[in-house]
């Protein structure tokens, strides 16, 4: 009989532990990636450089660039290319007009490399934590 009671006691503890873990999992806040449409008007265009101000980005968040592909594009670049408005060799422009780009941890730099567009502040720098 003692053996039976020990098994029941162990089973009861296992159930209580399982229930506690379940409650914790249900209450946990799961961090999900956020999606941001670039540009105050929802369009990737000139004078976008200030758009990221006041926003908090995380690695895995997605930036959506909406634009007319006959007039603009998006190129992910490094800080030097961003500051100089130069497209590095081998950089692949996004050209769909509805590009979705996932942020990596750290600094992320984007420009339009159509002539004189980056120089007209069609560029953004985003830091993702």
Swiss-Prot record:
- Name the UniProt record assigns to this protein: Basic blue protein
Cross-referenced InterPro entries: Cupredoxin (IPR008972), Phytocyanin-like (IPR039391), Phytocyanin_dom (IPR003245), Plantacyanin (IPR041844)
Protein origin, superkingdom: Eukaryota
Q: Which Pfam families match?
A: Cu_bind_like
MF terms from GO for this chain are: electron transfer activity; metal ion binding
Q: Name the tissues where it is expressed.
A: Expressed in the inflorescence and in the transmitting tract of the pistil. Detected in roots, stems, cauline leaves, cotyledons, hypocotyls, guard cells, pistils, sepals, stamen filaments and vascular bundles of roots but not of leaves. Not expressed in petals, anthers or pollen.
Q: Where is the Phytocyanin domain?
A: 34-129
* Swiss-Prot/TrEMBL induction comment: Down-regulated by microRNA 408 (miR408) via AGO1 and AGO2 in response to low copper availability.
- Alphabetical keyword list: Copper, Disulfide bond, Electron transport, Extracellular matrix, Metal-binding, Secreted, Signal, Transport
Disulfide bond residue pairs: 85-118
By its UniProt entry, which Gene3D superfamilies does this protein fall under? Answer: Cupredoxins - blue copper proteins
Query: What is its biological role?
Result: Forms a concentration gradient along the pollen tube growth path, with a lower level in the stigma papilla cell wall and a higher level in the transmitting tract extracellular matix of the style.
Q: Which residues form the signal peptide?
A: 1-33
Subcellular location per UniProt equals: Secreted, Extracellular space, Extracellular matrix
Q: Which gene encodes it?
A: ARPN
Which example biological process does GO assign this protein? pollination
What organism is the protein native to? Arabidopsis thaliana (Mouse-ear cress)
Q: Does the keyword Membrane apply?
A: no
SUPFAM superfamilies associated with the record: Cupredoxins
The entry summarizes the disruption phenotype as follows: No visible phenotype.
């Amino acid at each position: 009989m003692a053996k039976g009671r020990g098994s029941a006691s162990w089973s009861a503890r296992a159930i209580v532990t399982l229930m506690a873990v379940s409650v914790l999992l249900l209450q946990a806040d799961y961090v999900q990636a956020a999606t941001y449409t670039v540009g105050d008007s929802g369009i990737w265009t000139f004078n976008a450089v200030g758009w990221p101000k006041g926003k908090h980005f995380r690695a895995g968040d997605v930036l959506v660039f909406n634009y007319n592909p006959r007039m603009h594009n998006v190129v992910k670049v490094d800080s030097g290319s961003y500051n100089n408005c130069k497209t590095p060799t081998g950089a692949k422009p996004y050209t769909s007009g509805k590009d979705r780009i996932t942020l990596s941890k750290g600094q992320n730099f984007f420009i339009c490399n159509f002539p004189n567009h980056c120089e007209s502040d069609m560029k953004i720098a985003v830091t993702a934590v």
